[in-house]
């Protein structure tokens, strides 16, 4: 007989014999089939997340808060950065803010709001989505004006 792939067989006793579990006492693995006493794990088992009667994790953790779908997250620009990057009598637009790396391009998703951190001495015209009350007062005190988009 020639040695070919379809003729190959393992050496005798090199592989353990298969046990067909739960097929009677004579087969050696009958009745409880190696599963021990007849409990929950002998059967189908339990669903994912089941903790044996203990209150499961997803119910122990409280239900806290929610995400408001109407919440608007602004890109913040402070007066101090406008003071540094703009000269007198300039107009602050969304394009100029982007060119000076003060905002990201995603203006549709995150509108721009100017806040009053720092001091403003230059006369500027702001064309942005929103301005805080203190920032509006500081701009108007410096002789500038605010145009909300």
From Swiss-Prot:
InterPro entries: Ribosomal_uL15 (IPR030878), Ribosomal_uL15/eL18 (IPR021131), Ribosomal_uL15/eL18_sf (IPR036227), Ribosomal_uL15_bac-type (IPR005749), Ribosomal_uL15_CS (IPR001196). Residues 17-28 have a biased composition (Basic residues). GO terms for biological process: translation. Transmembrane segments: none annotated. GO terms for molecular function: rRNA binding; structural constituent of ribosome. Disulfide bonds: none annotated. Gene3D superfamilies: 3.100.10.10. It holds the Pfam family Ribosomal_L27A. It comes from the Bacteria. Residues 1-54 are annotated as: Disordered. PROSITE patterns: RIBOSOMAL_L15. Keywords: Ribonucleoprotein, Ribosomal protein, RNA-binding, rRNA-binding. Binds to the 23S rRNA. Belongs to the universal ribosomal protein uL15 family. NCBIfam families: rplO_bact (TIGR01071). HAMAP family: Ribosomal_uL15. Part of the 50S ribosomal subunit. This is Large ribosomal subunit protein uL15. It comes from Mycoplasmopsis synoviae (strain 53). The gene is rplO.
